[in-house]
From Swiss-Prot:
Domain of life where this protein originates: Eukaryota
Record-listed E.C. numbers: 2.5.1.39
Transit peptide per record: 1-45
Mitochondrial intermembrane side: 105-108, 193-200, 253-277, 322-332
Primary location: mitochondrion
Protein name, as recorded: 4-hydroxybenzoate polyprenyltransferase, mitochondrial
NCBIfam families: ubiA_proteo (TIGR01474)
Pathway in which this enzyme or protein is active: Cofactor biosynthesis; ubiquinone biosynthesis
Organism, scientific name: Bos taurus (Bovine)
Similarity section: Belongs to the UbiA prenyltransferase family.
Name of a matching Pfam family: UbiA
UniProt GO cellular component terms: mitochondrial inner membrane
Gene: COQ2
Length: 371
């Protein structure tokens, strides 16, 4: 009897103690939540942080992600989150504009800015056309399944209207040039619209891309000079085509398994394990053509120094390339922006040195005449 009463008393005390503890814990949790709410109400992001406390980023992808949500699919359709393609389209234009500058002068900054704007618009238009043609294929490839048209974020009709807007703005840029350049620029539209079809009918779609992407090598010179100089523009155009065959073959190795399954063609599937041999051949052809450009345009030592640096970069790129690792292919592909910038820098510095060499030659002639 006493044992049962004692046990009941113990159980009662235990129950009261647990109730008190849980009540205290509940009050403590309430205080903690209240403190958190007060902190959240008064919290302000520190410098370098976004609204959610994450580090701010000025990368193209971060800028697109911070844009109003309805605009984001259209910005991604233009590939503004991946600007490497715009750079690769723009850089041959800068080479041509730089080569067309008068000896001792910097390139025409107005033309550089005009062509930069045109590169953004035409690359966006080209990507829109490409995604419209390839929407059914893109759904079957892991890397491209999230593209706006393939994912259903933008309808075919809206993408067509958006394409019209981009081409209209690009036409406005083109009309700022001389008549020769307007006609030359308009001629590139055939290449822009047909390139996306090439991967269905030939193993050389990268060649078609090279013909399209390097049109600025012709257009930049004509925009400055009024017409093309074949001795400079044609080898420059050829070198750009070889360059595109290099970087886009590397790029194509990212999707070679999916492409083989769905029946698309590329130089990556054509060259297979011989890819590095082909890339080496394209590199030699590219450097040879750029050397001819230098001779025909009277380039000076900085230009040829830049070509040596480009050769070293290409050799390292090809030697270290792992064609079976998509991450490495993307890294090597994007590094080609550096190659384009080195060539542009070599052209600018080489052109600035032309005036010094001309002055030295003039002084030597005058000294000989005096003697």
């Amino acid at each position: 009897m006493l044992g049962s009463c004692g046990a009941g008393l113990v159980r009662g005390l235990r129950a009261e103690t647990q109730a008190w503890l849980w009540g205290t814990r509940g009050r403590s949790l309430a205080l903690v939540h209240a403190a958190r709410g007060l902190h959240a109400a008064n919290w302000q992001p520190s410098p370098g942080q976004g609204p959610r406390g994450r580090p701010l980023s000025l990368s193209a992808a971060a800028v697109v992600n911070s844009a109003p949500r309805p605009l984001q699919p259209y910005l991604r359709l233009m590939r503004l989150d991946k600007p490497i393609g715009t750079w690769l389209l723009y850089l041959p234009c800068t080479w041509s504009i730089g080569l067309a500058a008068d000896p001792g002068c910097l390139p025409d900054w107005y033309m550089l800015s005009l062509f930069g704007t045109g590169a953004v618009l035409m690359r966006g238009a080209g990507c829109t056309i490409n995604d419209m043609w390839d929407r059914d294929y893109d759904k079957k490839v892991t890397r491209t399944a999230s593209r706006p048209i393939a994912a259903g974020d933008i309808s075919t009709f809206r993408s067509f209207v958006f394409l019209g807007g981009q081409l209209t703005l690009a036409l406005g840029v083109l009309l700022c040039l001389n008549y020769y350049s307007i006609a030359l620029g308009a001629a590139s539209l055939l290449l822009v619209t047909t390139y996306p079809l090439m991967k269905r009918i030939t193993y050389w779609p990268q060649l078609a891309l090279g013909l399209t992407f390097n049109w600025g090598a012709l257009l930049g010179w004509s925009a400055v000079k009024g017409s093309c100089d074949p001795s400079v523009c044609l080898p420059l155009y050829f070198s750009g085509i070889m360059w595109t065959l290099i970087y886009d073959t590397i790029y194509a190795h990212q999707d070679k398994k999916d492409d083989a399954l769905i029946g698309l063609k590329s130089t990556a599937l054509l060259f297979r394990e011989d890819t590095k041999k082909w890339l080496s051949g394209f590199s030699v052809a590219m450097l040879g053509a750029l050397s001819l450009v230098g001779v025909n345009s009277g380039q000076t030592m900085p230009y040829y120094t830049a070509l040596a640096a480009v050769g070293a970069h290409l050799a390292h790129q090809i030697y270290t390339l792992d064609i079976n690792r998509p991450e490495d292919c993307w890294e090597k592909f994007t590094s080609n922006r550096t190659i384009g910038l080195i060539i542009f820098l070599g052209i600018v510095l080489g052109n600035l040195c032309k005036a010094k060499e001309t002055d030295k030659t003039r002084k030597n002639i005058e000294n000989r005449m005096e003697n």
